[in-house]
């Protein structure tokens, strides 16, 4: 099998250092693969550091990764900077605009539920902030994904927190939205069942979204939905992790899907395993905790904690989490018609798949 992609533990780069690129995305550029994401190496819940820039890794086989360092550095000195490390900035997503020949990076400020953009002449930077914080289509934004069609049109999919998924058309330069948008995947029960973290991919002319429920860093069941067009009404197909009895998407949250450029029908789901230290906690318990917490019944939750003697405390629902220990779950997607399945693999290789 040769080199393999391994799941179930921390990833190390070619120098043996722990990899830090959460909200992972992969780009294929000039014959190489580039994995990038939020650098959480100092985000242990006690430092006040939410992020330490955007880190990138390079690979020729998707199995071993060379650390290229920070392509977007934190601004340590200016507390008003959008890139100040104490600011709740996350979820980088980079897209190339053929017309402008610019690389465009979108990010969000989690606490303000606003987006901002940066641009660069090179994938590797330097990136320059090109907008202030804004509400896309005057809507609050949570986790998101970017995509472009074969004719060069760009779209953003984002969760309007606790209510629905929004698909908005990007401006020609990809640094904003035109104001045209649709909504889909509404969930009447809200938290913890409302959908977030949309990961888009396109296959055989159909558009797919993999989404998660709403339990913060704690994992939950995924859903996959399909549409005939980018801005269409997405129809839910079910949980792609149907073989996972824990109902936690293998203790992870899918962040993006990468289509291998040289392998036949190989789509790779990249997921964050935010809290490997809490994998023993049952979804059915914290699902109910989040439901109670969201509906502002905190006293009921505190009484329940005291009565049931749970191992984890209410503070674990806050942002004070040690996500410097976050890992990855990276798995191939299997298709049977419209059916989408993600099965657990301890180790696997892209070489198992036929060349195109």
Predicted segment positions?
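Carbohydrate-active catalytic/glycan-binding domains of CAZyme proteins
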Residues: 1-356
């Amino acid at each position: 099998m040769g080199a393999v992609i391994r799941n179930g533990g921390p990833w190390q780069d070619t120098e043996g250092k722990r990899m830090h690129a959460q909200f992972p995305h992969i780009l294929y550029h000039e014959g190489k693969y580039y994995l990038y994401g939020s650098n959480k190496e100092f985000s242990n819940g006690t430092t006040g550091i939410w992020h330490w820039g955007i880190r990138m890794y390079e690979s020729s086989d998707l199995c071993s990764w060379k650390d290229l360092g920070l392509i977007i550095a934190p601004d340590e000195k200016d507390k008003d900077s959008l890139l100040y490390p104490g600011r709740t900035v996350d979820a980088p997503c980079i897209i190339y605009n053929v017309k402008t020949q610019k690389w465009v990076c979108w990010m969000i400020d989690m606490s303000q539920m606003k987006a901002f953009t940066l641009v660069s002449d090179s994938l590797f930077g330097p990136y320059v902030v090109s907008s202030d914080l804004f509400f896309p289509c005057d809507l609050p934004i949570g986790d998101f994904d970017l995509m472009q069609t074969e004719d060069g049109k760009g779209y953003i999919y984002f969760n309007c927190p606790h209510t629905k998924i929004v698909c908005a058309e990007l401006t020609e330069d990809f640094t904003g939205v035109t104001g045209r948008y649709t909504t889909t995947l509404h969930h009447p029960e809200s938290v913890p069942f409302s959908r977030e973290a949309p990961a888009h991919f396109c296959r055989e002319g159909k558009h797919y979204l993999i989404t998660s429920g709403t339990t913060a860093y704690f994992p939950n069941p995924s859903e996959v939905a399909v549409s005939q067009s980018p801005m269409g009404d997405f129809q839910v197909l079910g949980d792609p992790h149907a073989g996972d009895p824990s109902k936690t998407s293998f203790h992870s949250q899918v962040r993006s899907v990468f289509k291998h450029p040289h392998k036949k029908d190989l789509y790779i789901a990249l997921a964050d395993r935010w809290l490997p230290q809490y994998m023993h906690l049952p979804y059915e318990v914290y699902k109910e905790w989040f439901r109670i917490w969201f509906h502002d019944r905190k006293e009921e939750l505190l009484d329940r904690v005291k009565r049931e003697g749970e191992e984890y405390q209410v503070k674990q629902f806050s942002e004070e989490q040690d996500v410097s220990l976050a890992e990855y779950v990276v798995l191939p997607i299997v298709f049977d018609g419209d059916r989408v399945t993600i099965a657990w693999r301890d180790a696997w290789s892209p070489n198992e798949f036929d060349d195109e």
